[in-house]
């Protein structure tokens, strides 16, 4: 029995070494793909960057790197054979993406998306493929209205306060000038011994009120109209993207 084992061991040794080398090479080629651990936020019309890297870090120049959008696997950007494959992009992303490859030698890449749209909101998947081995990571993009912080109350406050302060200041200056002018005229009239009606220079209250209120209401109405127009335009853009995603 011992002689049988000793005679068969040398013949099995090459097979064991080959299997060990295969396992070692297989484990050496494995890596993990890591994306941002939180949702990335962007405003409509701006540009956004989606970072992605492999761990442990290694040169990814010869790998296939890309981003796609689930659930239909629409290609957002694809890098293969050392160059970008623009012809394989989904139509809505052509001309809007750029792969930043300055640190690809360390296994780090970033996808830049220009002119962000409402339809870009949602999930993205980044993947690295090295021959037959592939890993990927999911990330989320949230798109916000650049005027989301403006509501009618804030708009009224922004519009009314500066104009109201300006009109109060102008009104006070106007009243001071009126009183000074009336005093000078009184002195001249007394010197000339003319009759003078004290109500001649009195300005009716409704005129002063109109002088203060009209300049306030004008800009306020204009700002409200501008606010509604901007929101209708953004809403129309969003509906148009939903109707024609491609």
Curated annotation (Swiss-Prot):
Signal peptide: 1-28
Gene Ontology terms, MF aspect: signaling receptor binding
Protein name listed in UniProt: Myelin-oligodendrocyte glycoprotein
Segments forming domain Ig-like V-type: 29-144
Residue spans, topological domain Extracellular: 29-153, 231-246
Gene Ontology CC: one annotated term: external side of plasma membrane
Keyword presence, Cytoplasm: no
Organism: Bos taurus
Localization in the cell: Membrane
Chain segments annotated as transmembrane: 154-174, 210-230
Function: Mediates homophilic cell-cell adhesion. Minor component of the myelin sheath. May be involved in completion and/or maintenance of the myelin sheath and in cell-cell communication.
